[in-house]
Curated annotation (Swiss-Prot):
Lineage, uppermost ranks: Bacteria, Bacillati, Cyanobacteriota, Cyanophyceae, Oscillatoriophycideae
Subunit structure of this chain's protein: Part of the 30S ribosomal subunit. Contacts proteins S5 and S12.
GO CC aspect terms: ribonucleoprotein complex; ribosome
Family membership noted in the UniProt record: Belongs to the universal ribosomal protein uS8 family.
Molecular function as annotated in GO: rRNA binding; structural constituent of ribosome
Function: One of the primary rRNA binding proteins, it binds directly to 16S rRNA central domain where it helps coordinate assembly of the platform of the 30S subunit.
Keyword terms: Ribonucleoprotein, Ribosomal protein, RNA-binding, rRNA-binding
NCBIfam families: PRK00136.1
Record's protein name: Small ribosomal subunit protein uS8
Length: 133
């Protein structure tokens, strides 16, 4: 099924896969989902990701990360902030701190997709896409 909000679709697929402890999940590939997956990997929320398929059927295979013998998911919450019907923009000085810095906010800036910490360091604001902790 085609989705108008690929970011929400990606977050939902990751959330559902973590809930049932799947080792991987597939997400349709776009530049935005690839960039978000890169940030998640850099921040240690996922193990790795790779592209599979060709043309229209191209997708990202995301390897999820768990901890301990009980395989508790590293990602406890994924929350979409800016939606197609209600965009949320924030200047550099007003970028949110997620759980006092424990979690991250993923921000789409003129410099690309990055975490709230990187955006503050570079002095740029942008669209707050989602919160993750």
């Amino acid at each position: 099924m085609a989705s108008n909000d690929t970011i929400a679709d990606m977050l939902t697929r990751i959330r559902n896969a973590c809930a049932v402890r799947h080792p991987t999940t597939k997400v349709p590939t776009t530049k935005m989902t690839r960039s978000i997956a890169q940030v998640l990997k850099q921040e240690g929320f996922i193990e790795d990701f790779s592209e599979a398929g060709e043309g229209v059927g191209k997708h990202l295979v995301i390897s999820l990360k768990y901890k301990g013998k009980t395989r508790q998911p590293i990602i406890t919450t994924l929350k979409r902030v800016s939606k197609p019907g209600l965009r949320v923009y924030s200047p550099c000085k007003d970028l949110p701190r997620v759980l006092g810095g424990i979690g991250i906010a993923i921000v789409s800036t003129s410099q690309g997709i990055m975490t709230d910490r990187e955006a503050r360091r570079q002095g740029v604001g942008g669209e707050v896409l989602c919160y993750i902790w």
